Amino acid sequence: MVGMGISQIQPEHMGAPAAKYAHAVKVDGAQSMVFTSGVVPTMPDGTVPPSLEGQTRVVWANLLEILRASQMGVTNIVSITTYVVASDTLTADLATVMAVRDEVMADHRAASTLVTVPALARAEWLIEISLVAAS
């Protein structure tokens, strides 16, 4: 089988993405795919950081652990869906979430959707992320 390729789809007749993501991602020749559930900000000891930034970092650490367990890394991510609890500080909250995502993703771009929601399954959770990765 020919090696896998991940390419960004950025149609010239569309505006540029609003942040550091791709409008779409095409995966050719994938041998393995990982679809995560919504990953939440619970640390191994069961605690949840109080701040959105702390929670976002825990979620990404958990996602990276899933990728490592699947013999994959950030460059295998093809799609991200992020849910953030809406608040009075939404603009700053979204900037925080995107800054952590950009730090983790570095120069890699994936298809990405960010959705604000009134609440998640537990009151202390402020963020939940699911992703798709391919190798």
Over which residues does each language-model region extend?
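Short, polar/acidic, helix-capping and beta-turn segments at strand->helix junctions
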Residues: 2-135
